[in-house]
């Protein structure tokens, strides 16, 4: 049995305010909202892909070096290696115009405030590559005047082993950084949330993979064999 609702006393003034001829069918607002979210979600996905594609293929390094590893870094800009194939041949003399910084060499304690200052002057998004054993862990300089790893005061994205590493290793680090950038999503630094604006706490790769590294270093006991 079907039931229908009819307006009572159609000649009343209420019917003039809500006449029958103005009634029309409307779509479900929930379904419409879901459709819009899927549509704009797809657009934002492609827009994010385009932004990451342009960003990873136009990485401008900051012209900054500390010691001998910088010579190997600059060698990658020669015609033999041709780093311009990866869109990273434009050296910037100002940190405000650079996309990433390469810590190539020994980070002395006296230079740590300068490196930190230059990193703070770089605009977001920005990345850091630690090049060489000295920048990674202090290298052979286990002394009071050398910082035992630049990740003590900077968030490092890519580590390049070697003393000194070859230019091919630096190019490999650029390709790894490009892969990491292609997977990033906004926001990268400052976040506008419900509780206000706050800065994203970026941890270094060394801190994030600390447990994994310790599990590899620890040797299994004899009972485990």
Swiss-Prot record:
SUPFAM superfamilies registered for this protein in UniProt: HydA/Nqo6-like (SSF56770)
Cofactor descriptive note: Binds 1 [4Fe-4S] cluster.
Enzyme class, spelled out: translocase
Similarity annotation: Belongs to the complex I 20 kDa subunit family.
Annotated keywords: 4Fe-4S, Cell membrane, Iron, Iron-sulfur, Membrane, Metal-binding, NAD, Quinone, Translocase, Transport, Ubiquinone
Function in brief: NDH-1 shuttles electrons from NADH, via FMN and iron-sulfur (Fe-S) centers, to quinones in the respiratory chain. The immediate electron acceptor for the enzyme in this species is believed to be ubiquinone. Couples the redox reaction to proton translocation (for every two electrons transferred, four hydrogen ions are translocated across the cytoplasmic membrane), and thus conserves the redox energy in a proton gradient.
One GO process term, biological-process aspect: aerobic respiration
Required cofactor names: [4Fe-4S] cluster
Subcellular location: Cell membrane
Organism: Buchnera aphidicola subsp. Cinara cedri (strain Cc)
Chain residues that bind [4Fe-4S] cluster: 68-69, 134, 163
Name of the protein: NADH-quinone oxidoreductase subunit B
InterPro entries in alphabetical order: NADH_UbQ_OxRdtase-like_20kDa, NADH_UQ_OxRdtase_20Kd_su
Superkingdom, taxonomy of origin: Bacteria
Subunit (UniProt): NDH-1 is composed of 13 different subunits. Subunits NuoB, CD, E, F, and G constitute the peripheral sector of the complex.
Catalytic activity, EC: 7.1.1.-
Catalytic activities: a quinone + NADH + 5 H(+)(in) = a quinol + NAD(+) + 4 H(+)(out)
GO molecular function: 4 iron, 4 sulfur cluster binding; iron ion binding; NADH dehydrogenase (ubiquinone) activity; NADH:ubiquinone reductase (non-electrogenic) activity; quinone binding
One family name in Pfam for this protein: Oxidored_q6
A cellular component term, taken from the record's GO annotations: plasma membrane
């Amino acid at each position: 049995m079907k039931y229908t609702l009819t307006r009572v006393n159609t000649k009343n003034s209420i019917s003039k305010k809500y006449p029958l001829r103005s009634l029309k069918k409307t779509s479900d607002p929930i379904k419409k909202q879901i459709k819009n979210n899927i549509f704009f979600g797809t657009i934002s996905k492609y827009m994010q892909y385009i932004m990451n594609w342009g960003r990873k293929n136009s990485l401008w390094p900051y012209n900054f070096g500390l010691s001998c590893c910088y010579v190997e870094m600059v060698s990658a800009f020669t015609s033999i290696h041709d780093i311009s194939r990866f869109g990273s041949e434009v050296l910037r003399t100002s940190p405000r115009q650079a996309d990433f910084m390469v810590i190539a060499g020994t980070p002395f304690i006296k230079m740590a405030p300068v490196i930190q200052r230059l990193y703070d002057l770089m605009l977001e998004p920005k990345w850091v590559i630690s090049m060489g054993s000295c920048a990674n862990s202090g290298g052979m300089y286990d002394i009071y005047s050398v910082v035992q790893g630049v990740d003590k005061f900077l968030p490092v994205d890519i580590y390049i082993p070697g003393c000194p590493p070859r230019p091919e290793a630096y190019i490999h680090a650029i390709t790894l950084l490009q892969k990491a950038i292609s997977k990033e999503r906004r926001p990268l630094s400052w976040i506008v949330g419900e509780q206000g604006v706050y800065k994203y706490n970026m941890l270094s790769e060394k801190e994030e993979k600390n447990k994994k590294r310790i599990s590899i270093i620890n040797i299994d006991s004899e009972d485990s064999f």
